[in-house]
C-alpha cells in the first residue's frame, strides 16, 4: 500500500470523526436546519452540487481530476521537516544480507571490459628463440665454411 493512499484513508477517518462530533454538538444547539431539496426533478443535480460545495472553501475545491489544490511551499515544508537519518542508518546497519565474494566477483567481471578504458593491453611474451643448431654444429660450420685459422 502506498503512503499516499494511507494518508488519504487517515484523512477520511479524521474527517468522519470530526464530522460526527461536530454534528452531535450542532444538533443540540439551535442552528439552521439543512436546506431541503425540492421535489422537482429539473435542476436536482445542480442543487446537490451546490449543497456539497457549500462547506468547501474556495481555494480548497477539488480540481477536475479530484485533487485538492495545495501550496507547493507547504508540501516542501512538510517533507523537509522530517529527518530520516536515524531511520536510514538503522536500516543499513540491520541489513544482514551480505553477498558472497564469488557473486560479487562474477558481477564485477561481467561489467568490466565493456568500455575502452577497461580493456587490458595484452603484452606479448618475448620467447627466446632456441636454435635448431647446437654450438658444436656452429663450430663445424665455421671450420667448413671459413676454413681453419
Curated annotation (Swiss-Prot):
GO cellular component: nucleolus; small-subunit processome
Coiled-coil regions listed in the entry: none
GO biological process, one term: ribosomal small subunit biogenesis
Superkingdom as given in the UniProt entry: Eukaryota
Assembly notes: Part of the small subunit (SSU) processome, composed of more than 70 proteins and the RNA chaperone small nucleolar RNA (snoRNA) U3.
Keywords: Nucleus
Classification via Pfam families: AROS
Keyword Chaperone listed: no
Protein name in the entry: Active regulator of SIRT1
Bias type Basic residues, positions: 43-52
Amino acid at each position: 500500500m502506498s503512503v499516499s493512499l494511507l494518508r488519504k484513508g487517515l484523512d477520511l477517518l479524521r474527517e468522519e470523526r470530526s464530522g460526527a462530533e461536530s454534528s452531535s454538538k450542532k444538533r443540540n444547539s439551535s442552528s439552521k436546519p439543512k436546506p431541503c431539496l425540492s421535489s422537482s426533478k429539473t435542476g436536482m443535480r445542480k442543487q446537490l452540487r451546490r449543497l456539497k460545495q457549500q462547506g468547501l472553501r474556495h481555494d480548497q475545491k477539488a480540481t477536475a481530476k479530484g485533487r485538492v489544490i495545495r501550496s507547493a511551499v507547504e508540501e516542501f515544508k512538510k517533507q523537509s521537516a522530517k529527518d530520516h537519518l536515524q531511520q536510514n542508518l538503522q536500516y543499513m546497519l540491520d541489513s544482514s544480507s551480505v553477498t558472497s565474494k564469488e557473486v560479487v566477483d562474477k558481477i564485477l567481471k561481467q561489467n568490466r571490459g565493456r568500455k575502452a578504458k577497461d580493456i587490458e593491453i595484452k603484452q606479448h611474451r618475448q620467447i627466446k628463440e632456441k636454435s635448431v643448431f647446437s654450438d658444436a654444429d656452429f663450430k663445424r660450420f665455421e671450420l667448413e665454411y671459413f676454413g681453419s685459422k
